[in-house]
């Protein structure tokens, strides 16, 4: 990011490693994520999230973008200013079920983005909201609908969007569907390849539908 000019992007929406050693909770020899129900049978490529980004990353992110939304912002409070804009993704988990799924996830938003907001969308193991069923191959994957909700609320047509940790590519698909300019980065070659394949399938299907 150091090569980018100030405010090169209108909005950065990022999901960096939280430093909670997610991969340490999985079966190291085949990447099977531990947990209850169907999620325990899902195979993921193992990645290392034990090292979260430091203060330099967040300083640069805020320099190159006019506004930011940072998933896991509750883990990075020491690096971020106070804000009223907390986005809560309510996964609508059942209260009477014992599982290892979080009921919600938090994202820090730049103070100028307004008050706290809640997005409700089922995302619990193999149970998903919406009319489609998204393929899942990344342990911290988020639904396309979540990113569409964010972009519809906080971005405008013509805005430039940045995602520094592309992961499964859900943000890219959402930006593509909404006609937003988008730049995404992914260091892990396995996830980069899977994301590219996922995006190619999605864009081809969308073009066939339009044609």
Regions from the language model: what does each represent?
Residues 49-55:
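Alpha-helix-centered segments that form part of catalytic cores
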Residues 2-14, 18, 22-48, 59-211:
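Class I S-adenosyl-L-methionine
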């Amino acid at each position: 990011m150091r090569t980018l000019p100030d405010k090169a992007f209108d909005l950065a929406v990022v999901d960096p490693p939280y430093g909670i050693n997610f991969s340490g909770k999985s079966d190291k020899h085949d990447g099977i994520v531990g947990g209850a129900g169907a999620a325990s049978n899902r195979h993921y490529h193992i990645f290392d999230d034990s090292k979260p980004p430091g203060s330099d990353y967040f300083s640069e992110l805020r320099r190159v973008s006019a506004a930011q939304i940072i998933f896991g912002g509750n883990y990075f409070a020491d690096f971020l200013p106070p804000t009223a804009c907390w986005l809560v993704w309510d996964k609508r988990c059942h209260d009477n079920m014992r599982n290892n799924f979080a009921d919600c996830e938090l994202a820090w938003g730049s103070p100028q983005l307004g008050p706290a907001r809640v997005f409700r969308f089922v995302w619990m193991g193999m149970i998903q909201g919406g009319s489609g069923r998204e393929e899942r191959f990344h342990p911290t994957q988020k639904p396309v609908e979540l990113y569409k909700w964010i972009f519809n609320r906080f971005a405008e047509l013509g805005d430039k969007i940045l995602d520094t940790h592309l992961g499964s590519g859900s943000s890219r698909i959402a930006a593509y569907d909404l006609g937003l300019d988008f730049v995404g980065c992914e260091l892990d070659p396995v996830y980069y390849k899977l994301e590219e394949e996922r995006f190619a399938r999605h864009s081809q299907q969308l073009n066939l539908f339009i044609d």
